[in-house]
């Protein structure tokens, strides 16, 4: 089994759930913490907030797993494209 944990900051849980479904996953758990894709799973492990300049910034830990390394890499690439933010 191959796995990778990502820590995402600044994107709320609702958007993360939307991104997971956009890349082909369906919710498995009623509490929207476990998602199943084709030959892969994504799980929201932890949701917390960090305080910065009078704001609470969401910090979400996601665990992706697959039996195939190539599948895992493709899923993570798709997910990273969804979460990419360009600043100036």
What does each model-identified segment do?
Residues 6-12, 67-68:
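Short, surface-exposed ligand-recognition loops at beta-strand->loop->(often short) alpha-helix junctions
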Residues 15-22, 74, 78:
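Long, highly charged amphipathic alpha-helices
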Residues 13, 19, 85-88:
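Conserved mixed alpha/beta catalytic, RNA-binding, or beta-rich assembly cores of soluble enzyme
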Residues 2, 7, 17-52:
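Ser/Thr-rich, low-complexity intrinsically disordered terminal regions
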Residues 50-88:
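C-terminal basic regulatory modules in eukaryotic proteins
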């Amino acid at each position: 089994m191959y796995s990778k944990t990502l820590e995402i900051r600044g994107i709320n849980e609702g958007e993360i759930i939307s991104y997971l479904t956009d890349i082909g996953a369906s919710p498995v758990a009623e509490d929207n913490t476990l998602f199943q894709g084709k030959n892969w799973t994504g799980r929201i492990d932890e949701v917390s907030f960090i305080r910065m300049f009078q704001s609470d910034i969401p910090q979400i830990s996601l665990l992706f797993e697959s039996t195939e390394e190539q599948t895992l890499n493709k899923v993570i690439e798709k997910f990273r494209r969804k979460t990419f933010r360009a600043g100036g």
